[in-house]
């Protein structure tokens, strides 16, 4: 058996994640306009656009554990190929939908067959040495962030020149390229676990190194995504309330991008720091840091100040999801790592669905500032809970 160079796999998986992140961010910003172009009445555009976006996350949350079970049984590379090829059809096929019902149907299928990023994460986590998992998974996460930042620029340019449907064809091409790169260059010598040594899913949660931490890390993923997405629906409106009336969308986009760029810069650095001082320690510190920044955002007095705070916020996010992923990889047996990452993805998706609804509800009742206060409170509770859970482990670097 030849030794697999996990660093080579990391490079290819990073680029695959970049293409996947770009594909997602290419589609979402244009969804309301595309829904309108399909003939939906103006008063229903927001509803159907929201449905088209959320239905994908909901179906992904429901089916993610199934793909995790299959990945542990047949390998992570086949699941990456399956996701890439299936999403080539479901995302590229959006270019040909004749009405809103076909759009919703394809978005539903897209979520059902999604899973390139979590399987890429599980693949690298299963191959990288435990002591370098923070560095590797932190680096891997920057691929999605970089793609998410790049996507809207490419999409806007293509949409202006050739129309929105051409954007969907481009997305399909990106995902097909990700699948081809996986087929040709990703190396995985997967050895199925013998039946008598296989870990049933029911027993998996008790076979990890620290069973009580597993669900806690799942909940942490939920809170991280919930808090991040709760801001999305109100950010542009908050920027306007802070006095920005001209070029509102452009300025709002810059503020979003500032956080993305700082997150991309910090993820690799935070991953290395987590390997050096302990990912569990760094996770608690990063959550406490997030609470402070959310409170500062709630008291911002200008769009420039808000942008600065969001940039600073991004510097800490490199220790959040990558930190959770590193901890999951360290406490989980390799025979069950795909299932654990799949279940974690369920909580991540649910946070992405519930967060925007909660943020909008709080803003409607108490104003835009209140969303940041409420979000900081949620993260503070999660931070305190993690501190209690990790209290006996904070004395050691590795868990």
Where are these regions (language model features)?
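Central cavity-lining transmembrane alpha-helices of secondary-active solute carriers
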Residues: 51-67, 257-269
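Helix-loop junctions on the cytosolic side of multi-pass membrane transporters
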Residues: 182-195, 387-399
């Amino acid at each position: 058996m030849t030794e697999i160079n996990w660093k080579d796999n990391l490079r290819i998986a990073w680029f695959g994640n970049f293409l996947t992140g770009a594909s997602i961010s290419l589609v979402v910003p244009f969804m309301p306009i595309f829904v309108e172009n399909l003939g939906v009445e103006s008063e229903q555009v927001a509803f159907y656009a929201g449905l088209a976006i959320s239905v994908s996350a909901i179906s992904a949350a429901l089916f993610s554990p199934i793909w995790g079970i299959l990945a542990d049984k047949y390998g992570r590379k086949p699941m990456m190929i399956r996701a890439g090829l299936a999403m080539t059809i479901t995302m590229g096929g959006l270019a040909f939908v004749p009405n809103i019902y076909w759009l919703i149907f394809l978005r539903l299928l897209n979520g059902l067959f999604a899973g390139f990023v979590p399987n890429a994460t599980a693949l690298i986590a299963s191959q990288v040495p435990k002591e370098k998992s923070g560095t590797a998974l932190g680096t891997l996460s920057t691929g999605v962030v970089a793609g998410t930042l790049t996507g809207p620029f490419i999409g806007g340019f293509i949409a202006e020149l050739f129309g929105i449907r051409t954007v969907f064809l481009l997305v399909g091409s990106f995902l097909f390229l990700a699948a081809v790169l996986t087929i040709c260059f990703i190396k995985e010598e997967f050895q199925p676990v013998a039946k008598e040594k296989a870990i049933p899913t029911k027993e998996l949660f008790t076979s990890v190194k620290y069973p009580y931490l597993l669900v806690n890390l799942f909940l942490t993923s939920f809170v991280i995504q919930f808090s991040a997405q709760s801001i999305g629906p109100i950010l542009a409106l908050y920027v306007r309330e802070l006095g920005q009336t001209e070029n509102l969308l452009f300025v709002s986009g810059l503020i979003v991008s500032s956080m993305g760029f700082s997150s991309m810069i910090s993820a690799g650095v935070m991953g290395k720091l987590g390997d050096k001082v302990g990912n569990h320690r760094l996770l608690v510190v990063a959550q406490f840091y997030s609470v402070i920044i959310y409170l500062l955002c709630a008291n911002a007095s200008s769009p420039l100040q808000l942008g600065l705070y969001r940039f600073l916020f991004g510097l800490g996010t490199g220790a959040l999801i990558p930190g959770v992923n590193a901890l999951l990889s360290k406490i989980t047996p390799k025979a069950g790592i795909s299932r654990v990452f799949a279940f974690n993805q369920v909580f991540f998706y649910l946070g992405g669905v519930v967060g925007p609804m909660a943020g909008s509800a709080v803003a409607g009742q108490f104003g835009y500032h209140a969303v940041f206060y409420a979000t900081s409170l949620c993260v503070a509770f999660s931070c305190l809970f993690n501190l209690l859970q990790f209290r006996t482990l904070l004395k050691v670097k590795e868990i």
